[in-house]
From Swiss-Prot:
Domain of life according to the entry: Bacteria
Record protein name field: 1-(5-phosphoribosyl)-5-[(5-phosphoribosylamino)methylideneamino] imidazole-4-carboxamide isomerase
Keyword Isomerase: yes
Signal sequence, start to end: none
Gene transcribed to yield this protein: hisA
Entry keyword Cytoplasm: yes
GO biological process: L-histidine biosynthetic process; L-tryptophan biosynthetic process
Catalytic activity entry: 1-(5-phospho-beta-D-ribosyl)-5-[(5-phospho-beta-D-ribosylamino)methylideneamino]imidazole-4-carboxamide = 5-[(5-phospho-1-deoxy-D-ribulos-1-ylimino)methylamino]-1-(5-phospho-beta-D-ribosyl)imidazole-4-carboxamide
EC number(s) reported in the record: 5.3.1.16
Cellular localisation: Cytoplasm
Protein family according to the UniProt entry: Belongs to the HisA/HisF family.
Originating organism: Xanthomonas axonopodis pv. citri (strain 306)
GO MF annotations, alphabetized: 1-(5-phosphoribosyl)-5-[(5-phosphoribosylamino)methylideneamino]imidazole-4-carboxamide isomerase activity
Chief site of localization: cytoplasm
Matches recorded under HAMAP family: HisA
Amino acid sequence: MSFTVYPALDIRNARVVRLLQGDYARETQYGDDVLPRAQAFADAGAQWMHLVDLDAAKAGGYTLAGTLGEIARATGLRVQTGGGVRSREDVARILDAGAARVVIGSLAVRNSEMVVGWLQEFGADRLTIALDTRQDADGIWQLPVHGWTEAADATLDQLAVRYARAGLQHLLCTDIARDGMLSGPNMALYGHLRALTPQLQVQVSGGARNLADVAAAKAAGCAGIVLGKALLEGHLNLDEALAC
């Protein structure tokens, strides 16, 4: 299995931002130079990037189709993107706009039966399921919903197995406690997922801060790692991460 580094840009109000643990009230802005940043990713040798529409994630209705198309045309990057995907039409529109892969998050938790149908319709290589998780007091990995205030009916383990059996290829998993904290990825979580669903290509997300974290994700047999805040704040050099 090859290993992919996904430099990431989260967009809100046409600006590059980062949220702490997904909290919209704890936002750091990094400017509105979206295309130049994407071009810099390509110039460093990246093949892929991860693009998130935070406005749509909150309100629904993907808003970055124009930006996505511009990035894909200008840079040649393959773009994995999501935010606010609520319907089959959303998936089709984002793919038509130039996405290589569409990320489906909360809907994948709320309506797995519908999303499984999309795997068959659009092809498993065109979709990434993104599951945000938090470990409860009993050590169970829950899937918080409704603004991360309640737990879904299914646990992370149950949903990962369900999707794996349905033919899912790409799973992006974020430990909420690590998201945006530069505290290192929770490699125990990813080791657990790899053992539970070895057929899935698991992407590490949340907490990456240095080359050692990239190397650890690769050594654990994960398929890739999403790098956001560490790149934006200069803790990590993309050229070195790509060569790791």
